Amino acid sequence: MILISDSMRATGLCDGDYEFGGLHVAVKDSVARTDDGSLAGSTSTLFECVQCAVKFGIPEADAYMMASQTPAELMGIKAGKICEGYDCDLIVLNEDDTIHKVIINGRIYE
């Protein structure tokens, strides 16, 4: 099993009105909708999907693997695990599972 997010460009933005692909999208309480009320896509990050999976009872290590190594292997990408010869971007968590820092292409973001 893998975890995915169909997050759209409003992910991480404050509630408000946006235009994406020529469509007006209103984000309220982290829910994005078009003018006719249809969902415009998810505003959940993959990290939030992992946290949700854990809340539903999936072991934490399995949830992280479902969001990283498993999909990478299915797509034939050398990523998703810390191993020689693999691309490795990381999130470093605090004890309360909040993000402490992110490492992308060797660059540290705090």
What do the predicted segments below correspond to?
Residues 1-86, 90-93:
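His/Asp/Glu-enriched, well-ordered alpha-helical/loop segment
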Residues 94, 103:
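Short, acidic, Ser/Thr-enriched surface-loop or helix-capping motifs
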